[in-house]
C-alpha cells in the first residue's frame, strides 16, 4: 500500500482489536498485479540503494530509530491494541526494536571483505547487496521482527518489499510513515522501501515466486515456510519457523528459579512466541516441588486488558485462536492430560493453563502457540533428551542444572539451534545467532548474522603483469 513513495488507500481488510473485538482499522489488500508493481519498483531502485554510501545507510537507520524513540509510547500502545500484548511487554518490544536498528546501523559501516595471499598477484573480496529483499513478518512481534529483517537489508544496501501480517498491520504502517519521512529528509528515493499489505496467499505468494526478489526472509508457520521454500526456487531463503521448545529441569537445579522461568517464559504474549516453552521435562524426584511452584507463580498472573499496566497476559490474536487452544486442551485431557489450573476461555482470552501430560500426548508433539504449559515426568536426563529430540522441531531448548559438565553434555546431545543453560528456551538477544534445525527453519537471524545472509561475496583477482 506504499509503493514508489505513494500511498494506496482502500478499505479492503478489517483489522480488529483482539481484546475488545472492535474494528479498529480498514487497510488495503494489494492484488497480485499491485504486488508485482511493488516488486518492480524495488527492483528499479536497487542500484540506487546499492550505491548509497555505508555512512548514508547508517544515518538512515539511526534516524529511523530516533523517530521511533520520539514516539515510543505511541508504538507501544499500538502494539498492544494491534496484537493484544500487555503494554509492559510492548514497551520492551519497542526498546528491542531500537537496539535492532542501532545494531543494523553499526554493521552498515562494518561490512568488509578480506585479502587472500597469492604469489601471482592480489586476491580480495568485497560484500555486495543481493538486490531486493522480500520481508514477510508475523503478528506476534509486529515491530521488532520487521526491523530484524529490514534493518540488515538497508544496512547491506538492498531495497525492500515488506509484507506484514494482515492480522496486525497497523504498526507496520506507522513504521513506514517514519521511513517515508526519513528517506524524504535524506533525499533518497522512496522506492527503495515498499509496503505491501494484504493477504498472504496473494502478496506473500507473489513475493516468494517473483524472479525480481533476490531473497525471501520469512518468520511464521512451518506450513507456510515450506511453501515459500518450494516457490522460491533458486532465490535465497531465510526461514524462522515454529518450535515445541523443551525445558529440562534436573533434580540438582534451583527448582524455584526454574519454575519462575517456566511460567514467565511460557505465558509471555499469551504463549504466542516461537521460542515459548513447549514442554517442561522434570526429573521425577523434584516433579512435585516444581509443579507446586509453577502453580503458585501461575496464580499470581493477571489476565485482562493489555493496556492496563498490571496485566500479565492479554488475549490471543483472535477468538478463533483461543477456540483452537480450548480444543487442544480438551484433546489433551482426552489423551490422559490432567489440567492443574486454568484453561478457561472467554472470547480471545484463555486463562493460563498448566497440564500434566506424558510423551504421547498431543501437547508434547505440536507447537501450541497459546498459554498452555505442559509438564512431563522423566526418570533422568537421558530420557529427557530422548523425548526432546523426538520432534520435528529444533528451535531452542533450556536446561536447568547446577552441574556444568552435565549441562554441556546435554547441550551437545540436544538437536536444537540454541541451548539456554539455566534459562528458558525463550531467551533471546538481538545480536546473538538465532534459528533452528529440522523443520524450525533455515539460516540464522540476529543482526550480524542476518547482515551476512543478505550479502553476496564478490572475489576480485589482480594478476601480476
Swiss-Prot record:
Disulfide bond residue pairs: none
Keyword Oxidoreductase: yes
Binding site for NAD(+): 220-225
Keywords: NAD, Oxidoreductase
Pathway note: Cofactor biosynthesis; coenzyme F420 biosynthesis
Gene Ontology MF: a single term: lactaldehyde dehydrogenase (NAD+) activity
Gene3D superfamilies listed in its UniProt record: Aldehyde Dehydrogenase, Chain A, domain 1, Aldehyde Dehydrogenase, Chain A, domain 2
Catalyzed reactions: (S)-lactaldehyde + NAD(+) + H2O = (S)-lactate + NADH + 2 H(+)
CDD domains named among the record's database cross-references: ALDH_LactADH_F420-Bios (cd07145)
Enzyme class of the recorded protein, top EC level: oxidoreductase
One Pfam assignment: Aldedh
Catalytic residues, chain numbering: 240, 274
Source species, domain of life: Archaea
Enzyme Commission number(s): 1.2.1.22
Function per UniProt: Involved in F420 biosynthesis through the oxidation of lactaldehyde to lactate.
Assembly behavior: Homotetramer.
Assigned protein family: Belongs to the aldehyde dehydrogenase family.
Cited NCBIfam families: lactal_redase_Meth
The name this protein goes by in its record: Lactaldehyde dehydrogenase
